[in-house]
């Protein structure tokens, strides 16, 4: 069954801007929250998690990019990149998750 967000996250009104991404339970520092963005060729796609995480100059999350080499799929003829979100510190229940935006500086 498709789940747009990991079970430990939810979307709620944010004091930062509009809607934001919030922890439904405590999350430990270094936790891999999942995929926020995927780039195939020049096209960048964001997941619901990537779409709702708000910017902060003092973020509690960071992203890491992983290159995926395509060797088997004839429909996707290029390698692609996947960005995953990780927590930078322990996150409290109901705390908003934030990230320093850098994607649009690619």
Where are these regions (language model features)?
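Conserved catalytic SET/PR domain of SAM-dependent protein methyltransferases, capturing the structural core
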Residues: 1-106
């Amino acid at each position: 069954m498709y789940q747009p967000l990991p079970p430990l996250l939810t979307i709620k009104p944010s004091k930062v801007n509009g809607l934001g991404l919030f922890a439904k339970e405590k999350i430990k520092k270094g936790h891999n929250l999942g995929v926020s963005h995927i780039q195939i060729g020049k096209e960048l796609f964001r997941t619901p998690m990537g779409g709702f995480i708000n910017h902060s100059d003092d973020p509690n999350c960071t992203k890491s990019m992983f290159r995926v080499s395509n060797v088997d799929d004839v429909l996707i003829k290029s390698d692609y990149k996947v960005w995953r979100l990780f927590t930078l510190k322990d996150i409290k229940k109901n705390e908003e998750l934030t990230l320093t935006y850098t994607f649009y500086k690619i």
